[in-house]
């Protein structure tokens, strides 16, 4: 595995890959890798000759008072995991390397950001698409792989690629879970022992909503309330949101007559976790 810490080194290595006509799959991450990230690498390796992973904690997507400074980081650990999984090129830039001067251009997302995480994190997805587009320009991959645990991010990035005619295929990949159903997340390490025992209740509550939907309930408000009640019964932290939205348009709906996303965000003492289920219409 080749580790590149500068843009020039990355681009020099990628020129070699292109000269050899090798296809490139890209897995962008913020590090502190877990099985969810590694499952993206596995998928990329199945479909491409070369796999590039980036590890960069992007300051543009963190707002005031958010967890930029405390976001878990362990590059030595991440490097070992990436190499063991078969990553070919690991791009690990500093903030100064990615943003050597104050930005004169920043993308602004105008659709699908006033709900879910975007509602309480103004500017978050502007920062996400800005860094993702920059990484796409640097890596020029054939395809990029994203986990559906953050389905809103997948939708926003997909829309950005379509709107700007970016020549990168977006490959959404299923959420990877612990055996008890908790979605794999870098923030899980910040849960207390008690919170870790409660946390699978996020997924269980989503399943309760899915069960009501499967039983024939089409009123989105009823589904939301069923999920909320389940969360209140199972967990002792604070509900950030419970939503039932169209997907991938992320529009509020009253009746469920299309593919929807059931989504929750929950605030524990030192970690905010999100989870979701996408329910295709007719299933």
From Swiss-Prot:
Keywords: ATP-binding, Cytoplasm, Ligase, Nucleotide-binding, Pantothenate biosynthesis. It comes from the Bacteria. Pfam families: Pantoate_ligase. Gene3D superfamilies: HUPs, Pantoate-beta-alanine ligase, C-terminal domain. SUPFAM superfamilies: Nucleotidylyl transferase. ATP binds at residues 30-37, 147-150, 176, 184-187. The keyword Nucleotide-binding applies. Pathway: Cofactor biosynthesis; (R)-pantothenate biosynthesis; (R)-pantothenate from (R)-pantoate and beta-alanine: step 1/1. One of its GO terms (biological process) is pantothenate biosynthetic process. GO terms for molecular function: ATP binding; pantoate-beta-alanine ligase activity. It catalyses: (R)-pantoate + beta-alanine + ATP = (R)-pantothenate + AMP + diphosphate + H(+). Catalyzes the condensation of pantoate with beta-alanine in an ATP-dependent reaction via a pantoyl-adenylate intermediate. NCBIfam families: cyt_tran_rel, panC. Belongs to the pantothenate synthetase family. PANTHER family: CYTIDYLATE KINASE/PANTOATE-BETA-ALANINE LIGASE, PANTOATE--BETA-ALANINE LIGASE. Homodimer. This is Pantothenate synthetase. It comes from Halalkalibacterium halodurans (strain ATCC BAA-125 / DSM 18197 / FERM 7344 / JCM 9153 / C-125).
